[in-house]
Regions:
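Sec/Tat signal peptide C-region and signal peptidase I cleavage site
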Residues: 11-17
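Axial heme c-ligation environment in periplasmic c-type cytochrome domains
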Residues: 50, 89-98, 158-160, 179-210, ...
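The canonical Cys-X-X-Cys-His
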Residues: 129-144, 176, 203-207
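Periodic glycine anchor positions in long extracellular repeat architectures
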Residues: 142-147, 183
């Protein structure tokens, strides 16, 4: 179960802390998972899925354990305090946006402090991503990314439905890359670290585009061509890879954010 996986991760912390970047990367992944999946557990301050809520509680506890195991530096105590605050917000069943902000801010700090890889070295090859998806992913996630592949039956938790627009808007290409690289403890999602970095980024961008249709991509292409503000939001591949539709909507508004995200997930070379 996810609970047992988290306990196992926690018990191994002193060993894993020998590699601070790996430990920080795992903490980042948990924070990203919390930011994306918390709304499935809590809505309007009420528990709507007890199993999901238990996972959120365990994941926030695990983040604190992992950060505590990292070598102290000048920001160590402050990061531990932020992790404790996030744990308290989950315990209080705080609003999803507040959870996403808190988890996202701490995750961004980890990227910077531990220099976690946050962008592809070259423009992702979407055709390669599509081919890899067909070979490696359809059994669980389904041919169109709906989480309905032939091997998905009985999986607990079920495979991610990449076409779920509500969750997709909180998920960056970077978060998909990290899950592809490391797997997700407590689920059937294994690590694909045997693939090259380029292949993993190609898969991340391809799966990150499955929630968007051709109309949204076309609208995004038109906006990108004419909207200088939109182009300033995405100056390079690093900015694009770390961006979520939800974050971009704070600057561009919901409609433009969705269209631009749809276009650039399919045409990342536009920012290169």
């Amino acid at each position: 179960s996810v609970f047992l996986a988290v306990v196992a991760l926690a018990s191994a912390r002193t060993v894993r802390a020998a590699d601070p970047v790996a430990e920080a990367r795992q903490a980042w992944q948990l924070l990203d998972y919390i930011a994306v999946d918390y709304p499935a557990a809590i809505q309007n301050g009420q528990v709507v899925d007890a199993v999901e809520y238990a996972e959120m509680q365990e994941f926030t506890a695990s983040v604190g354990i992992k950060l505590a195991a990292l070598p102290p530096d000048s920001g160590h105590a402050a990061r531990l305090a932020k992790a404790k605050q996030l744990q308290g917000l989950v315990a209080e069943r705080a609003d999803a946006e507040q959870i996403a902000r808190s988890a996202g801010a701490l995750a961004s700090e980890l990227l910077t402090v531990y220099k976690i890889e946050a962008a592809p070295a070259a423009v992702p090859d979407l055709a390669r991503g599509a081919a890899l998806y067909a070979q490696q992913c359809t059994a669980c996630h389904g041919a169109t990314g709906r989480g309905d592949g032939p091997a998905a039956g009985g999986m607990d938790p079920p495979p991610i439905a990449f076409t779920d627009a509500d969750r997709a808007k909180h998920r960056s290409a970077l978060s998909l890359y990290q899950v592809i690289s490391q797997g997700l403890p407590g689920t059937a999602m294994m690590s694909y670290a045997h693939l090259s970095n380029d292949d993993r980024w190609a898969l991340a961008y391809y799966t990150g585009g499955l929630a968007y249709d051709a109309a949204a991509r076309d609208q995004g292409a038109a906006i990108w061509a004419d909207d200088e503000q939109a182009r300033r939001v995405f100056p390079d591949l690093a900015a694009l890879s770390g961006a979520t539709e939800a974050d971009v909507s704070k600057t561009l508004g919901a409609d433009r954010a969705r269209a631009i995200t749809a276009y650039l997930r399919g045409e990342p070379g536009a920012v290169a």
